[in-house]
């Protein structure tokens, strides 16, 4: 069976999409290639790294990347995680499905916001896996 590809996209590839990539690799397992990117690059937020470390997922080696058109075109599913990414997502080929899963941006907010958004992303990916 060929691996499917899921591509998580948000504005800066700093918090939400980084956490989604970490959870995606953990939850979806070997059957999926999991990537993340941003409309811009803001660097991986240290609090996102810490939030994921708290649940034993290491994203410290992740980099903040711009959308890669090759990955985009080969994706089975592109998931936008904020309205900016949803509105500015490049045109997708007809074979690529797109979904919007909106999450609040925890950047610049209290630690508890990082934990809440992290946990909401986990639940969304768990629900997706059950489809």
UniProtKB/Swiss-Prot annotation:
The organism of origin for this protein: Staphylococcus aureus
| Gene designation per UniProt | arsC
Can you supply one Gene Ontology CC term for this chain's record? cytoplasm
Complex formation: Monomer.
Q: Which residues form the signal peptide?
A: none
Give a short account of its post-translational modification. Cys-89 performs a nucleophilic attack on a Cys-10-Cys-82 intermediate, forming another disulfide intermediate with Cys-82.
Q: What is this protein called?
A: Arsenate reductase
Q: Identify the NCBIfam families for this entry.
A: arsC_pI258_fam (TIGR02691), PRK13530.1 (NF010053)
Report which reactions are catalysed by this protein: arsenate + [thioredoxin]-dithiol + H(+) = arsenite + [thioredoxin]-disulfide + H2O
Q: Where is the active site?
A: 10, 82, 89
- Give the result of residue 123 to V, as annotated: In strain: SW18
- Which top class of enzyme applies to this chain? oxidoreductase
Question: What are the GO MF terms of this UniProt record?
Answer: arsenate reductase (thioredoxin) activity; metal ion binding; protein tyrosine phosphatase activity
Changing residue 94 to T has the effect of: In strain: SW18, SW4, SW24 and SW1
Its Enzyme Commission number?
1.20.4.4
Q: Mutating residue 130 to S: effect?
A: In strain: SW18, SW4, SW24 and SW1
HAMAP family annotated for this entry?
Arsenate_reduct (MF_01624)
The annotated consequence of residue 87 to V reads: In strain: SW18, SW4, SW24 and SW1
């Amino acid at each position: 069976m060929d691996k499917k590809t899921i591509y998580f996209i948000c504005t800066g590839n700093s918090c939400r999409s980084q956490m989604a990539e970490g959870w995606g690799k953990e939850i979806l397992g070997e059957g999926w290639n999991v990537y993340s990117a941003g409309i811009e690059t803001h660097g991986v937020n240290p609090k996102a790294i810490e939030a994921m470390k708290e649940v034993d997922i290491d994203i410290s080696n992740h980099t903040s990347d711009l959308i890669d058109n090759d990955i985009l075109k080969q994706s089975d599913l592109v998931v936008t995680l904020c309205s900016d990414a949803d509105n500015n997502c490049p045109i997708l080929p007809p074979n690529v499905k797109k979904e919007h899963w909106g999450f609040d941006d925890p950047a610049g907010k209290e630690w508890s916001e990082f934990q809440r958004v992290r946990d909401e992303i986990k639940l969304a990916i768990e629900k997706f896996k059950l489809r």
